[in-house]
């Protein structure tokens, strides 16, 4: 997300930008919030700043390019709770739901993990981030960055991590 798309949080946005511009960004950043407070938009803002840089993002915003188009970068990975479609067979992964995920980001940037699960029309099923997904995280992190810069992984709904 562009900085201007995030409601409030001016001090935090400035601190994030300053940290990134000085190259002082930690290898792991944790955004904890209550539903609707902007943790996900701040994480997306931070991710885009790390990958593209301030000047590029500023130019794209001036040109009217949607920030959501910038989320489709090969070095930006998303992990989120998923619903297994059927019993047996292979387990569902985040990649199976990527189209739904980008629709969710576009329509509900301040949504919580339950909003995400509701969008999947899961009925009474619970979304989880399973062992297979954690293994995929490990594999993705060890890949070389596509553009030679930074790689970013946004893990949404981490409270849904499961041992199965």
Model-inferred region functions:
Residues 163-164:
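Conserved D-loop-proximal element of ABC-family nucleotide-binding domains
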């Amino acid at each position: 997300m562009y900085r201007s798309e995030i409601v409030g949080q001016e001090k935090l946005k400035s601190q994030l930008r300053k940290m990134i511009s000085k190259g002082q960004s930690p290898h792991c950043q944790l955004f904890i919030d209550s539903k609707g407070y902007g943790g996900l938009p701040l994480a997306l803002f931070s991710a885009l700043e790390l990958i593209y840089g301030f000047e590029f993002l500023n130019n794209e915003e001036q040109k009217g390019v949607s920030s959501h188009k910038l989320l489709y970068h090969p070095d930006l990975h998303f992990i989120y709770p998923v619903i297994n479609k059927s019993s047996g067979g292979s387990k569902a992964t985040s990649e199976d739901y990527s189209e739904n995920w980008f629709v969710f980001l576009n329509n509900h940037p301040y949504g919580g993990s339950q909003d995400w699960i509701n969008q999947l029309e899961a009925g009474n099923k619970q979304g989880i981030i399973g062992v297979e997904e954690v293994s995929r995280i490990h594999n993705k992190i060890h890949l070389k960055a596509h553009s030679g810069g930074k790689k970013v992984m946004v893990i949404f709904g981490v409270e849904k991590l499961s041992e199965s």
